[in-house]
Amino acid sequence: MNPEYDYLFKLLLIGDSGVGKSCLLLRFADDTYTESYISTIGVDFKIRTIELDGKTIKLQIWDTAGQERFRTITSSYYRGAHGIIVVYDVTDQESFNNVKQWLHEIDRYACENVNKLLVGNKSDLTAKRVVSTDAAKEFAESLGIEFLETSAKNAANVEKAFMMMAAQIKKRMANAPVAPKAGVKLTPGQQVPSNGGSKCC
């Protein structure tokens, strides 16, 4: 076990271009915000270590490009992700409509039991809002995933979103059956789980 942390969780931020994924990451990792918008090219990542239930958790957070032309690059980053945060812009109906497509990408590329969180960003732009909180909440509930609205600009719920995701993953890890180690007796007919395939986390 690495003495610096108890857990290392890989998180992924996905969603349409311009919804504020990079801003959310900057706010959480560095507590900074910039109005100037530069599209992420391919992927970028930052690391932040948090404390949760007396455990030290290192979060490796990957920020992916939302543009279609980067899909083939970013799809490989789904593998091995413990948690995926799907971000849309509350002032952009199309970005919310496209959440279904992003969830399809998760089903296609990510681990079967990966944790998911739906985040509606830019909640500070109340006058420009087009996606209601209730509609998004209802949609998330129908899929059985958690939902939060955030504002990277004023830091509303940003910390909460990442902490919620970390707590979900930690809970899943704690409840997951431990693979048999060498010397452990297996019941007749029981197979040792392999580490191969896409069911990786």
From Swiss-Prot:
Pfam families cross-referenced by the UniProt entry: Ras
UniProt similarity note: Belongs to the small GTPase superfamily. Rab family.
Gene Ontology molecular function: GTP binding; GTPase activity
Protein's GO biological process: autophagy; protein transport
Protein name: Ras-like GTP-binding protein YPT1
Subcellular location: Endoplasmic reticulum membrane; Golgi apparatus membrane; Cytoplasm; Preautophagosomal structure membrane
Organism expressing this protein natively: Phytophthora infestans (Potato late blight agent)
GO cellular component: endoplasmic reticulum membrane; Golgi membrane; phagophore assembly site membrane
Keyword terms, alphabetized: Autophagy, Cytoplasm, Endoplasmic reticulum, Golgi apparatus, GTP-binding, Lipoprotein, Membrane, Nucleotide-binding, Prenylation, Protein transport, Transport
Binding residue positions for GTP: 15-23, 33-40, 63-67, 121-124, 151-153
NCBIfam families assigned: small_GTP (TIGR00231)
Activity control mechanisms: Rab activation is generally mediated by a guanine exchange factor (GEF), while inactivation through hydrolysis of bound GTP is catalyzed by a GTPase activating protein (GAP).
PROSITE patterns: RAB (PS51419)
Chain span(s) of sequence motif Effector region: 37-45
Disulfide-linked positions: none
Keyword Lipoprotein recorded: yes
Record bears the keyword Lipoprotein: yes
Membrane topology: Peripheral membrane protein; Lipid-anchor
Alphabetized CDD domains for the sequence: Rab1_Ypt1
